[in-house]
Amino acid sequence: LARRWLILLLIPLYLYNLGSPGLVGPDEPRYASIGREMAASHDFITPRLDHQPWFEKPPLLYWMVALGRAVHLPDEWAARVPVALLSLAFLLFFLETLAAEFPVRVALAATAILATSAGWVAYSSVAVTDLPMAALFTAAMLIAMFDTRRDTGYIAGALLGLAILAKAFVPLVLFLPVFLISRGKRLTMIAGCLVVAVPWHALVWIRNGAPFWQDYFWKQQVARFFTPSLEHVQPFWYYVPVILAGLFPWTPLAGLFARRKTYDDVRVRFLVAWMIYALVFFSAARNKLPGYVLPLLPALAIVLAFGLDRTGVKRKWWLMASGLMLVALPAIAAGLPEALLAGLRRAPHVFLPGIPFVIVAGAAWWLAWRERSTLALAAVFGGAVIGLFYLKAKTYPALNERVSVRQFWRDHESDAANTCVADSVRREWRYGLNYYAARVLPPCSGPGQVEITEQSGKLELVTK
């Protein structure tokens, strides 16, 4: 019970200011719009964007958004709270599962690393499909690996089915190595997966026919992997810096992969082999986005926690290095908003907010030096939590102003009846404008209209 306090400490961090920035990027407004339409129409089979079928993703996230709206949460909260709560529930499961399989100190360290890594926290705060898929897939993977009871195969399979409903067929590819080592549970896992994943796919295919498979499977799965048509092409090595950045502030622990003792346990060796397999798979794809490799972070946290536990007296150096990373948080928090608003060359140098993090880093350093490794780990964890609070408080207003269209639309909503959108407006802002307008804003076609245009990276309203 005492170890669950770790999760209780995370609840305020994960729910803090979720509604502060408006919906951002092209994905959040689209997914929130589809969930809103599902809640209004009570059609939970065919996803619709602006009343037209939309087969880019399966429905789990849309169902979650619809549930948020059903309990009358505001727009951004309805979209993001279900994802944050799923992340917290997974972290509790992660902690308890590892505590039953490894020493409790390893379970606590792995959960602390994952729960405060920048990548996991970031994707727990936005309404996109990456976090639900990563959490559900990892839960299926851990049950398949660590629970020897044959009937738990149904649970692992059902969770894998939910992961498929979160992000289509990628979880099947990732699960293949786990399936191959789970000899006693293969049939039960297949049964559990089919029971959960097949009904929606069958119903949406019956209702929509060939257009569903053409878009959902051939375009979004096959073409996304093999062709550059979706315009997210990146080099083969792209995910190495993405993963290292996603680990912040625990990035220095990646050096533990160079230590032989990290591989003392067969379970860890399998996880490392699985991560290599998954990394090669994602790297081979033509289209790459940072969130694709989110499923690697839980396994990575386990390996790093185990490796840290095997470092002995040298553990202090690894914790000291992670503690020092906290010093960068104020610079990130101070520089990121200005970078978003005015460009990197005008980002300010602000030193005073860094003092508390220097103190925390110094405390972690001192505790590690005194061989108080558990307290040093707790100091880094606590500093990361405080730093992430600080980062959210400092950056969310800038995200709302610079990346979301919510404030712009609220300021000009009185002109909505005659508003049109110029061709110059980028697609992510179009989706956001359509979401907050609750309709598709038409393209500009003649005089007498109030035109939304983009000038120097900002939206402006012009009367023609």
Where are the language model's segments positioned?
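Membrane-embedded architecture of ER/inner-membrane glycosylation machinery
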Residues: 150, 154, 259-464
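Membrane-integral, polyisoprenol-dependent glycosyltransferases
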Residues: 1-315
